[in-house]
Amino acid sequence: MAAQDQGFKSLRQLSASDKEFCFEMISHITSNLDLTETQLSQLKTAYRAIGSYLANQGGKLVECHIYAQGSVGIGTSVKPIDEDSDMDIDLVLHLPSQHYPTTTDEANELLFNLIRVLKDSQRYGDKIENMPKRRCVTLQYGGIEGQGFHMDITPSMPEDMDSPNHKSKVRVADIKDANSPSHPYGYRKWFRSACSKEIRWNRKSNYRSNNDIYAGTVEPLPGQGRKTVLQIVVQLLKRHRDMWKQNKQNVYGDCAPISIIITTLAGLAYEKCSNSNKEYQNPFDLMLDVLEEMPNFISHQYQSNGTVKYTIRNPALPTENFADKWHEKPMLPQAFKAWYTQVTEDLAKLLELDQGLDKTIERSREMFGSQATRGIQAKLADTLTERRAKNRAVVSSIGLGVSNAATATPVPKHNFYGDV
């Protein structure tokens, strides 16, 4: 039996109370990876100010629209392992009246012009980097509450000038290919739609909607809404990937799976679970099904030269293949397989029965880092005390008292966490 199959088997054999404890612990871990309310608010203010400044420069910038893409836009941000490292914030600067470049010279000119405009600003002149990246310019924003940030600003233009809105398909400047098709708004919309899909909970389940996830113990950011199972799973996998990548025993180096692949596979798997009409007893079982289904959305085709072409389609732009580099660099699919096997093995080891809470916390720290597990033991102990006070606690074989009774309380309709 494959290592990951054995891992899934052992995880599925956990008792109902252990599964509740496990997902509650995972929820606490991912909450430590979130941006704070202050950080989110100041970032939103910061990039809106950038948009206002650019719009005031006239010309093609007058009607520009700036918005967050990537993890910040879909509520799956993960703080860096090294707390001294900057966090990437991906922004799209849409230019509705600008034709997309058709040559690499035009792409270079567009990006350097954007740098020049920001250089002329007293506010941004010392923050903008002198050279563009392949598709964006970078603004070193500085720190908020001890966390450093830099903003990658990607200019986009309408693919069809008859549909200039940023909500349509776009082209982004690309100094190697002149332009690249993209649909960042569509991807964000797709992922948010996946998050909001209803799950069928068993009539004996404590859960009645996506929002009923330990509502009494996992605090959402005020005004940001409660995270869904899908967002929690993506954050967990991304942090595990980050830790796995820097492990000295990892022979794959920078070939670790990129975030867009992890996020897309998890989102597609979650949609399949929702559409299956399967009834779930708890979010832990849903998480396991999502993990197990992820590889099924990677297609492969053998080429005449003996190589394999892999495809992971962008749900918002099916012509885009997120695995396009896997064909050229065989280490990439090998790294994905190695990481995927490792994450299932690690989760099984983390949740081994009879190891006690202290050992579980120690293993979670090794797997996700000290930042992610900060305060987790106290949080779980507080939860146990609260449940015992209500005479609803039973003893988990993992070593923490957890409740078989309802632990989640209804919450309002989900307002997307990280909606910036």
Report each predicted region and the residues it spans.
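Terminal (often C-terminal) interaction modules
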Residues: 1-30, 295-420
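Extracellular structured ligand-interaction cores
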Residues: 86-90, 134-136, 148-152, 234, ...
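Conserved catalytic core of two-metal-ion nucleotidyltransferases
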Residues: 53-58, 74, 108-182
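N-terminal regions immediately upstream of nucleotidyltransferase
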Residues: 1-86, 97-110, 398-402, 407, ...
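Extended, alpha-helix-rich binding/interface surfaces that flank or overlap catalytic cores
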Residues: 150-222, 393, 399, 420
